[in-house]
């Protein structure tokens, strides 16, 4: 649930999900940089963190290349994100 301050921003609850996804080798964003993946414009989502083994990267740079097996933390509407990531 959202706090009063978050509700006051006017964002619908479903648009503010924090998702944790493991990138598969056939993911449309595996092997791409954040800039190339362009999730911000494609599905109105932001990648806020990436875990690669023991390495944890908060707010990765746009030239960071994502690999299969990376754990990606994304903020956005889960329905849009899943639909995009499941497309081939």
Cite the ranges covered by each PLM segment.
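Cytosolic regulatory regions of ion transport systems
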Residues: 1-88
């Amino acid at each position: 649930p959202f706090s009063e301050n978050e509700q006051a921003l006017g964002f619908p609850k479903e648009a503010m999900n924090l998702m944790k996804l493991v990138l598969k080798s056939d993911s449309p964003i595996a092997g791409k940089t954040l800039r190339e993946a362009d999730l911000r414009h494609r599905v109105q989502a932001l990648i806020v963190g990436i875990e690669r083994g023991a390495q944890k990267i908060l707010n990765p740079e746009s030239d960071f290349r994502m690999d299969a097996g990376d754990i990606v933390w994304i903020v956005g509407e889960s329905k849009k994100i899943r639909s995009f990531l499941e497309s081939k």
